[in-house]
């Protein structure tokens, strides 16, 4: 007679097998009723023997108790976004850039996939068992949604098959099929619950439930599309090969993934998917096109927050017609005057749209737009609504001309338009309340100075009450002054003051980004900080010197140079430093002057370390003159292999690069 442990093992194995056939192979071999019977049998046995329940049991998908809030998970490998193209010409230009950058006659093949309209997630398996899952978040840090992801039946709690890596992080999309979406909304209308505008919102709402039991009731599903972390194992050297391997291990992969041998085949794939879009049963908003060869991907690399080897080819956005009620003018952080059409509300691609950007005066002229016109609205990239054209054949008799302002609608300063630029700008600078508000909101934002609790409404009140004129004024605020604001009690006020004090300790890159210099984003700010090292060196840099920084051209260099040439900007910076804003001095290391076995060497760490964290090891190696790289190449001098070292170790051995273990690293660090 079988033992209880044997019965449980057999039931779990059988259920996992049928989940694989149903969700991955799309070829169920037993009726739903039989699956339900097996699940009931397993559940009854586990109820009688709770000490034998395992985390990867199929019964554990039902969800645990509600969470008070989501904790954060930092992505070991950033979850990057993709650049978009919207027409054939743009895709062909991307194709040419790839061919030119590779600078070889080697053929490029493309792996083409559906661009699912859901939520990007990262799922980590250790020794084949699901241990954590996270949202994309800001690409660096996401929310811990492990409990909710465990309830999605398409996602295996345990991988099956051979040669499963010690650590494998898969990336993919959680989405809601249209039938499931309609059922959720039907139930919500019947019970008076929340009705979702589209399947993506419903998927997001379902996945971000603090109560996993609610998520478990939603028919979410999942497709894999990539890998993040890989340790203690190997994967094929093509993107398609990796997806096929995922499928062998039990991970669901779309059956529409296609290998294309040319740009013409990619375009044919795009048009076929566009034709089939209405019958897929789930929402997509384009196709994703990736260089299939991992070696070529590595050669192409990345720019800022996106890879050079992949692109999202978006479908034409959905369009609707409505009327323009009025045109208003908004003033942005850098003084840009943006006309905004106020519309008769209309649903476009599942979202109620009441405003649409008109971009600038040239666009209004191009459209021939008048207030009262009937217009076609498009959600560009399915995100930002814009006016596509005016329906001239249905123009009402009482339309009015759109008059672009010559004075700022907020502060009354002159509006000027520099020759060669499409954007008109308010010349008021920080005397303009709108610019001041937007500049301050940018300054305190999470990726800039990161002042916790300093929201938009607080900034609005501070500017309106004339408490704050420049960023430096923020650090002069007291709890007493803040308490006078709406919805700001003594405790909240003190929390903001404490957050401002904490924010004084920053990095040079964050500080530069926070200043809001035109066209200086996070990546450019980081590049400037790394290249010049000190504020003094950057302030003194010429336009020619600035252009030596990677990705800084004449336009950005001019903006940076002009910013520091402006006396009022230098005064604000001096005030900020006087208020105590500071960052660590740059560490300048001359490898030739360091007596260390690591000095001047390019070192790669792989696998997990037992005696110190990887960040601590990196910091110590840098102190000793090493350059720590993220991947193995012919330029690598040394690889330090910890536990469960994977493909990096294999590549090092293949290239004949010196490899040492953690014990030897510690010995050398101690010497």
UniProtKB/Swiss-Prot annotation:
Swiss-Prot/TrEMBL cofactor(s): Mg(2+); Mn(2+)
Active site: 115
Binding of Zn(2+), residues: 408, 411, 426, 432
Taxonomy, superkingdom: Bacteria
Domain BRCT: 593-671
UniProt xrefs under Gene3D superfamilies: 5' to 3' exonuclease, C-terminal subdomain, 6.20.10.30, BRCT domain, DNA ligase/mRNA capping enzyme, Helix hairpin bin, Nucleic acid-binding proteins
HAMAP family for this protein: DNA_ligase_A
Record protein name field: DNA ligase
Species for this entry: Escherichia coli O157:H7
């Amino acid at each position: 007679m079988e033992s209880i442990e044997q019965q449980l093992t057999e039931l779990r194995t059988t259920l996992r097998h049928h989940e694989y056939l149903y969700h991955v192979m799309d070829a169920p071999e037993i009726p739903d009723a039989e699956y339900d019977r097996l699940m009931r049998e397993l559940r009854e046995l586990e109820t009688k023997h709770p000490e034998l329940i395992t985390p990867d049991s199929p019964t554990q998908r039902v969800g645990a108790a509600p969470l008070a809030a989501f904790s954060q998970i930092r992505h070991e490998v950033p979850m990057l976004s993709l650049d978009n193209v919207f027409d054939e010409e743009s895709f062909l230009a991307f194709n040419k850039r790839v061919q030119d950058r590779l600078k070889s006659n080697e053929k490029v093949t493309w792996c083409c996939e559906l661009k699912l309209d859901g939520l990007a997630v990262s799922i980590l398996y250790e020794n084949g068992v699901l241990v954590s899952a996270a949202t994309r978040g800001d690409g660096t840090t996401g929310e811990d949604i492990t409990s909710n992801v465990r309830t999605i039946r398409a996602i295996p709690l345990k991988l099956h098959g051979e040669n499963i890596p010690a650590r494998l992080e898969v990336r993919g999309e959680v989405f809601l099929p249209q039938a499931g979406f309609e059922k959720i909304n039907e139930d919500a209308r019947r019970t008076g619950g929340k009705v979702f505008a589209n399947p993506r919102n419903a998927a997001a709402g379902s996945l971000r439930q603090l109560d996993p039991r609610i998520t478990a009731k939603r028919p979410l599903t999942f497709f894999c599309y990539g890998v993040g972390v890989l340790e203690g194992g190997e994967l094929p050297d093509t993107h398609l090969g990796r997806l096929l391997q995922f499928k062998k291990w039990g991970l669901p992969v779309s059956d529409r993934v296609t290998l294309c041998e040319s740009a013409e085949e990619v375009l044919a794939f795009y048009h076929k998917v566009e034709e089939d879009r209405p019958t897929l049963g789930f929402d997509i908003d384009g196709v994703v096109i990736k260089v299939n060869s991992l070696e070529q991907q590595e050669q192409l690399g990345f720019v800022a927050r996106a890879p050079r080897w992949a692109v999202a080819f978006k479908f034409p956005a959905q369009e609707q017609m409505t009327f323009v009620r009025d045109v208003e003018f908004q003033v942005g952080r850098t003084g840009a005057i943006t006309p905004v059409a106020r519309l008769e509300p209309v649903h476009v691609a599942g979202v109620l749209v009441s405003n649409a950007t008109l971009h600038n005066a040239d666009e209004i002229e191009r459209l021939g737009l008048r207030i009262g016109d009937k217009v076609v609205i498009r959600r560009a990239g399915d995100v930002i609504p814009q006016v596509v054209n005016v329906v001239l054949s249905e123009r009402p008799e009482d339309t009015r001309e759109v008059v672009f302002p010559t004075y700022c609608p907020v502060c009354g300063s002159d509006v000027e338009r520099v020759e060669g630029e499409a954007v008109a700008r308010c010349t008021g600078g920080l005397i303009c309340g709108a610019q001041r508000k937007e500049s301050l909101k940018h300054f305190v934002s999470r990726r800039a100075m990161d002042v916790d609790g300093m929201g938009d409404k607080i900034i609005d009140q501070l500017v309106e009450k004339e408490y704050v004129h420049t960023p430096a004024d923020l650090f002069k605020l007291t709890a007493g002054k803040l308490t006078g604001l709406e919805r700001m009690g003594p405790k909240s006020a003190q929390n903001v003051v404490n957050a401002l004090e904490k924010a004084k300790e920053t990095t040079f890159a964050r500080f530069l980004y926070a200043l809001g210099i035109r066209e200086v984003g996070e990546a450019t700010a980081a590049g400037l900080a790394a290249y010049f090292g000190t504020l003094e060196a950057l302030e003194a840099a010429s336009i020619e010197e600035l252009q030596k920084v990677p990705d800084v051209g004449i336009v950005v260099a001019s903006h940076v140079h002009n910013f520091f040439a402006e006396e009022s900007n230098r005064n604000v910076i001096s005030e900020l430093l006087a208020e105590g804003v500071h960052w660590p001095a740059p560490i300048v290391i001359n490898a030739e002057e360091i007596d260390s076995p690591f000095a001047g060497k390019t070192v790669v760490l792989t696998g997990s370390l037992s005696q110190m964290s990887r960040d601590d090891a990196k910091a110590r190696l840098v102190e000793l003159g090493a350059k720590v790289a993220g991947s193995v190449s012919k330029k690598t001098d040394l690889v330090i292999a910890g536990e469960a070292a994977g493909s990096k170790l294999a590549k090092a051995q293949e290239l004949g690069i010196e490899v040492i273990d953690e014990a030897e690293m510690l010995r050398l660090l101690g010497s």
